[in-house]
Amino acid sequence: MNNIYDTANQLAKEIQQSEEYMTYKIAKEAINLNFELKNKIEEFEKARYDAQIVALQTGKDDEAKMRHVQELYGELIQNQEASKYFDAEMKFNILIADINKIIGEAVQSLLK
């Protein structure tokens, strides 16, 4: 039987070689070269995070914060680089979520 750490290291390498990882990495590097766009994305991510925190703490969405997030996103996706970045980020996050789900299901009975 393989050492579980060897398997985990192999999984990490395969993630780094995946299309989702590579596409996200390239998109992120392109964003980092554009100072103005990078700042806009950071502003959007902070606004989205703040809106999520409020929703978690209060149990409801703050309409003004959500509207601000939507406005920022609407502006950003008009930019081709930003649109590619968000698409790549979403696909990478789906990959990681799927892997986490597989691992979670493997240990679920132990955690009950």
Give short role names for the model-derived ranges.
Residues 1-112:
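Terminal, compositionally biased segments used for targeting/anchoring and flexible tails
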